[in-house]
Amino acid sequence: VTSAGATAATPARFSTRMSRQFTLSFTRERLRSAKFLLFFWFAARFLILATWAFITPATQGDVVYYYQKIQVLFSDGPANTLQEYPTPVIWVLLIPYLIGFGNEHGYVIAFVCMMLALDALFSWSLWHSGGSMGGQAVVFWTLFLAMVGPTAFLRFDLITSVLAGWSIIFLLRRHSAVAGGLTALGASVKLWPALLWPALLPGPARQKFRATAGFLLTGLAMVGLSLLYAGWDRLLSPLTWQQGRGLQIESVWATLPMLARTVNSDNYAVTLSRYQAFEIWGPGVNTLLSASDIFFAGGLAVAVLAYLVWLWRGHGRLIEAVVLVQFVIIVMIVTNKTFSPQYMMWLGGPQAAAFAVLGTRSHHVEEFYVDRSRLNTLSMWILVATFLTLLVYPISYDFLVNDWNVRDSLLRFPATLLLAARNIVVVIVLIDVIRWVWSFLRPRAVKAVRQRRRGVEAPQ
């Protein structure tokens, strides 16, 4: 839904047209056909695996890194293994090591098969929980991971994306305690899902209590097990590991220095840090690093404020909870000084679950069509940003970081333009989410809901 003053050239009107055309390419019959969706899923996954095998085999580098770290786990001990990640990650990454019989090739294959199985299970849950929009949920998720490319199955960020999506689905099915527990499990793999807990509290007091209890009990259990397994220092190591990081070349903040490097490479240097990330150094970079720290903290403060206003307003709808989840995620992505390609995966699970949420709603109210239009538009922009991320990494990444020959220098400019375009679209995603959040948290909307609550609660 666009504003009355929007012209045909505005991004909002353009995105609405594109999302409508995209939606029409999948007929109602196809969206309701399990056979078609299964074929579509297999075709998309075959494309991802073929891309990995024949075009970008180097994308498995992180999985090989996991293997190497797990291989020395038995000699170095858990306190000195994968210190950049929460302790439970060791247990997750130990599974493919055991399945692959300690062999590197076996480890990579087992890891990919684990991620494929998780993907298939999440797709099945979207289909069975999505009501009238289960087909749309599966199509979005299938396309989304296809746009992510081989990275989808070669990083464990898929786990957190799926757990965030399942939290929403279980909340939809009124299993609040399970939703809270899944959110805590996500936080035990990557820390950021802990920020999603307030989104589990839109319902009555009993639901809030169960969601919070599930979150706290699961979280405390994971903390206790981690403490017993690897000790206090290892428990805290992920919190301090990132402190010395520089400006990663893919971050939104690095866009201007990366563009400047294409015309004046002598003033800028791209180096591989000890964090296994390429960072840019040069004029203005330190200022941008300071700005990113300020905006990151400010962005999270705004997200907390949005949660508080939403909970104070009351009568929170589940689709609003999903939008707030996406707001937290996209704020972290845009304002952070780091931005790895797998971060885009964080948006996919909750966005797919949003279709399931709408699919269980009545189609006879105006709110449904407004929310559906907004969801389709946001989904389109997320898919565009994700596809551009694939073009940046792994397709053109070497041209961004290498200075080995004339070919690298010549192709650096178009590769950097791709990176800049991706970052612009990611900012558009943030703006789109902010507009949606503002639609139900602006003062007039909050006042209307609270007046309606007082009218319902007043004695007759």
List where the protein language model places each region:
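Multi-pass membrane glycosyltransferase architecture that uses lipid-linked
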Residues: 13-240, 288-460
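Luminal/periplasmic active-site loops of membrane-embedded glycosylation enzymes
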Residues: 67-80, 239-285, 293, 420-423
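Compositionally biased low-complexity segments, especially N-terminal hydrophobic helices
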Residues: 3-10
